[in-house]
Amino acid sequence: MKIIKKIDDLKIVDKERPIALIPTMGNLHAGHLSLVEQSKNLKLTSLVTIFVNPLQFGPNEDFETYPRTIFQDEENLEKENCDFLFLPDKTELLDGIKNLKAPFSNFLCGKNRPGHFDGVITVVNRFLELINPEFCFFGQKDFQQQLIIHDHLKKNNFSTKLIVGQTV
C-alpha cells in the first residue's frame, strides 16, 4: 500500500484500473474494510481517504476527541491489500474550499445535526475533484448520506458511480 499525504502526490495513483474512492474519517471498522474488500473483488484500484473532517462537526460535537487510530487503520488496510491511502493535510485540503449546501439535510439525522451534511458533501466534493474516481463507496447504514451523495453526483455531472456496500 502506498501512502499519499500531499495533493500533488495523487498523480502516482495507478490509472490502469478504475479507481474506487472510499472516503473515511478513520477509526476503521469491519464495515469500512468490507468496502475495500468489495472494491478489490471488482478489480478496482482502491484508494481510501482518512480525514477527520472538521466541517461536519457541530457546536456540541467534539472534533478534538474523535478517535484517531491511524497506525491500526494502516495495518488493517494493509491486510485488505488496499492500494492507496490518502492522508491529506487539513490546511492543504481545505484551503480555498467552497462550502456547499447539502440537499435533504433538514430531516432524519440532519434535523438534529445542522451543517453536518454540508460539511460531508463539501469534503467529498473536494475528493471527487482531486481524484476523479470511477467509483465511490459508502456503507449502506448511512442512508441519508447516500441520498445526498447520489444527488450531488447527478446534479454536478460527475461520471463517478456510487456503490453502496452492505452493512457489516
Protein language model features and the residues they cover:
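Nucleotidyltransferase catalytic core that binds NTPs
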Residues: M1-V168
